[in-house]
Structure formats: structure tokens, C-alpha cells
Amino acid sequence: SINPFMHIGSFDAVWRVFDRDKGISVPLLTSYRATFEIGQFTNHILKADNVTQIVARNGEMPSVIHVRDKEKLIGIISEDIGRMRESGLSSVAVICKSAREAAGVFARLKDTHDVSLVGRDDKVFKHGIVVVPVYLAKGLEYDGVIIYDAGSHNYSGDNDRRMLYTACTRALHVLHVYFTGVLSDLIPPLDSGLFDYITIK
């Protein structure tokens, strides 16, 4: 579960409720969703004992993009959305840490893009460009994903690890991780070779 207070660390508790002799536990460790490059990147974030095996479908490397001036972040992301759409990606998600952050990003993007804000009460999958808080993104997938701000002030420690993993694994083809300030230590090291690193002043 993405909720750190509901995460099942061990299935022993489940077996105490159900008869172990009448069931089996089958770990699902093969991913068919993302490209090999995105899968390698996200496996490093999770640091799980059981590493997900990625079905070989190659694509572009994920990008980790440092925006030094936070005031420029929305404008740069807006331009990135435009490039993704022009390249043929039909669904693009800007994934934020919280509902409040998502609402703020949506308010600043809606004048330049035909964008939808995903909320808790939405019953129908929204197509095109969406802004979504990470806790509502689980189970969804998009051609391109933009992580709004993966700075250490937003994602740090094991409680945030699964949230960042969930956010990044929503991407099918393109993953761009933006950050301001200091990069979260949940992201693979700069010398890992798992992503392209870009700095924008």
C-alpha cells in the first residue's frame, strides 16, 4: 500500500487470519508497463528485496532536471508539457506530492494548457494533460510523467519512498523528474548512469 500507516511489511499477519494450508502467496515481480530504462530507475528508488523484472522495451532515459530558480519551475514544466504533446504523447501527468500542491500547479497551468485537475471525487479517468496528487495516481498510467518537485524538502525517508516510487512508475514512455533546492536522496546517485541530468539556471 502507498499509505505508510497501512503498509504490510510482512504477510505473516495475513496468514494468521487465513489458513496458511489453504492458500499460497505469489509475488508478482514482472513489470510490463514502463520501458526498461524507467524500470531500472524506479527499482533503485524502491530498494526492495524482490526487484521487479522489467520486460525489455527500450526507450529514452529518464531525465532528472534541476531548476535553480523555483520561480521558473512552472514555466519550464509548461514548455515541457508542450514538447511532450508535440512529440505525440496523448496523456501527460504532472504528479505532485499533495492535493494542495496539485491545486497550485493546476491554477498556474490552466491558462496555457487544456489541463484537468484530478481530485478525490473524480469517477472517470481524465485524458490529455492532468495534474494529480501522488496518492490518487496509484493504478493509473500515462505516456509521459512529470514529477513536479522531487527535492529533499518534498521527498525524504522511507515514508516517502513508496510515494515517489508510485509517482515515477506511472510513466509508460517518458519520465522527467524536476527538483528545486537539494535533490531527494531517494533518487539514484548522479553517477548511477540511470538517468540524464540537466541543470537549468
What are these regions (language model features)?
Residues 1-201:
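Conserved helicase motor core of SF1/SF2 NTP-dependent helicases
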